[in-house]
Structure formats: C-alpha cells, structure tokens
Amino acid sequence: MPSTQLRQTRLTQAKHVVVKIGTQLLIGKDGQMQLDYIQHIADQIAELAQRKVQITVVSSGAVGAGLVELNLPKRPKDVAKLQAIAAVGQRKLMTCFHDAFEKHDMEVGQLLLTRSDLDDRLRYLNFRNCIAQTHRFGCVPIINENDSVAVDEIRFGDNDMLAALACNALRADALIILSGIDGLLDHDNLRVDLLKHAK
C-alpha cells in the first residue's frame, strides 16, 4: 500500500490525534499573530470533535507571541530574557486559542510541561489523567513547553520532541506536525514520507 494511502487510512480510523503547531505558522513573517490560521485550526478541530475524534494540541509560539506583545524586533539570546518573553507570550497565545475555540462554544485547557514531567512516573500519570479528564469535559487540551523554567528546551526546541513524547504517553493514534519546514529528514538528509518507528 502506498505511504499516502496508508497515512489516510490510519488518520481516518484515528480516535485520538496529537497535533503539533509550529511557531512559523502561528507568527507570520510580519511578526504578527496569524489569527486567521489559528481560527482555521480551531474550525477543523471543532469539526473533528463533532465526529468524536479527540485532539490534543501541542503548540509552540510562546516566545514568538511574547516578542509581538512586547514589541521586540528580534529574539534575544539571553535565557532570562527569553523566559520572561515566553511568560508574557504564553498568555497571548492562549488568548488567541481561547477566542478561536469560543466561536464553537468550546473551552481550552492549558498544560505547561517540561520533558522531565514525562520522565517522572507520578507526573506522567497525572499528565495522562489530566488530558483524559480535559477531553471528558469536552475541552481541547493545549500543551506547551514550560519555557519559563525549561532552560535547555528554550534554547534548542520547537516542541517536536515534546509532541512525540506526549503522543506516546497518551497512546494517541497519530501525531500530526504542522510546520513551516519541508518535512522530517533521515540521517542521509532525505525526506521521510512515512515514519513507522521513532527511537
């Protein structure tokens, strides 16, 4: 079966999907929040919710949104500044998601994590239970890295690893990465069409 057809079959049968949204899609080249795009995502998730598909969102963009809110022209390198910018931006990001989902009478729930939260057994179980209950309430859980305390992640990540870990922890049926990047590359720098296994 061709990889495109296999992908479509798996997605059609999925009951719980983790969707990761990259910063480049949330913050435009003009440096402004892409409210139309966020609304488009909310519209699609609302439609899937009508079909009883659970969607858990992993969103990047706190630093980018903070730069917008604070009218800063470029991303600083200083970690303390980045953490403060992320703290401001996270509120803006969640406001944008809230406003988009409110048009569908849906609530959103915010979960801020670090990778170590999923390494600790008790916090891992608490995370899974919280996501499950958020879905039972009919809300959309929105996960972001806790950039205000996650020093390594704020320097190197855009939540791709967090999305993969969350997908595994939640035993979701699929992980969809929405990104401005052309795709995942293997060790030979060739684009991967279908990822069957990740280590």
Regions found by a protein language model. Give the residues of each.
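Nucleotide/pyrophosphate-binding catalytic subdomain
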Residues: 1-199
